[in-house]
Amino acid sequence: MLEKYISIKMRVNPVNNTINNTDDIKSTSLFPKKKNVFFIEGGGTKGVYAMGVLNYLYDENVYIKLQDVDIFGGTSVGSILAVGLSLGYQKKDFEKFVETFDLSKFVDSKYYAPFTLYRFLTKGHLYDDTNRQTLVKKILNINIETIRSHLDLPIDSDFEGTDITFWHLKKLIKKYPQIYKHLLINSVDISREQQIFMTTLDDNWDNIKLYDSILASSAFPFVFPSSKFYYNSTTQKYQYESLTDTNDKITENSFIDGGVANNIPLDYLILNSERFTDCNLWSLQFTTTPAYSKITGPIALIQKLINFAFSYGRKSFGLELIHEKYQVNVINLNLSANTFDTYNNNQIKEITRQIYDQCLSGQLHFDNVDSQ
């Protein structure tokens, strides 16, 4: 039963917030009144459990209305969910997505272990990336007809979800602030050894597609291939073109999973604290309960190493500063599930249903304690 390996606790002082939409994102203080910032931690296939909690938060509850969130942020699998939330997806949209969601297709069967090992030795990653890309395309296309309309595109436009850029999202936010929300996701430019924040909160990413940013944020090292962007050292921006009409120095840079640096992109708020003077922070996090599993070979060892890194690895370098500066509300999912646990579609639907039902009944509840 699900009760054996999941519990949810929330460190929160519930606040009845009044949300006023803001179009100007360049003011000294990003938002003139207290706003809500909602982060979803990276955790591989553990994101299935997060969907169950989000389903609950879509309904009336004593904590927060998702439509009252101003910025959604996430890392790795959290970036996928954050993008959907930023695009204004409703509960029915995520339910539509869950209907065809199947994580068992992400990894090779154990019978293909020799081929998996060969791919790793020759290409540097364990798994073919087709199914991850298909998943991201699917979630970006859920409401594409509405998005086309809101962007004033022709009815017969071939504009797809994979074409949506950060600039498009900023345009949607300005025109329909009740529906679309700001986005903040992180990745790691391993070529420059830097944590990178891809966001609508500045102009550096206007030409980059949400599709590519998700792939960059969720590119588990040695599991999936890294993403590639070109870096212009003159403009200090990333681009798709390897050449320019000027003499700017352009380098091809590799991006890997944001969880290598931080499982939630809280550091962006610290680095830009003058722009976030009055915010409530909400963070959906995973705490993994250690469990024994036998190491049967190099592939199993790599999987365990990555699971350890993303489950117990580095958190925000300034978490103490965050707690001092902001009201921090933490939803902590305590799981024995691993980063690479795979679930078929029926299992996914059952997990999300059970979590939703248990949140609704109070069997899984949010404990209110003062944030420190």
From Swiss-Prot:
One of its GO terms (biological process) is lipid catabolic process. A motif (GXGXXG) lies at residues 42-47. InterPro entries: Acyl_Trfase/lysoPLipase, NTE, PNPLA_dom. Its EC number is 3.1.1.-. It holds the Pfam family Patatin. Residues 38-270 form the PNPLA domain. The active site is at 76 (nucleophile), 257 (proton acceptor). GO terms for molecular function: hydrolase activity. It comes from the Viruses. It is an enzyme of class 3 (hydrolase). Keywords: Hydrolase, Lipid degradation, Lipid metabolism. Probable lipid hydrolase. This is Uncharacterized protein L620. It comes from Acanthamoeba polyphaga mimivirus. The lineage of its organism: Viruses, Varidnaviria, Bamfordvirae, Nucleocytoviricota, Megaviricetes.
